[in-house]
Amino acid sequence: MFYYGDAPSKNAVIKWLYEMAYKQGLADEKLYHSIMNHENVTSTYFGNYLAIPHPEIFLSETSFISVAILPKPILWDDEYVDIVFLVSIQKNNPNAFKLWSYLSFLISNNTTLEEIKKEPTFQNLSKVISKIYEDLF
């Protein structure tokens, strides 16, 4: 699930990304409320203009990521963000934690994030993530 375009606010981006997952049958309202509750408790800004909103607890039957790339950064709490990964990890699946390995590489690698921003398409995002997978495993 992928969005490229402008966004008025943090809450709007979260809602759009959640709605994409909802329309695919991957999310329900309980997940959305858990994500928003988590946002109210702590920031999901991770540095390098990247935010990773996620629920307080694992609620999904399937792991998924919804991605937004924003041509103009938006304020995310006290920082600016132009890439958002809404992440939900499958409950009761210890292998699903591998997803955080990919994301931690992205967070710490500014070059990779710049590659994604340079060509903000789903195809390029898939290519970059595939390369991360090859490099890590």
Sequence positions of predicted segments:
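Cytosolic covalent-transfer regions centered on His/Cys nucleophiles
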Residues: M1-F137
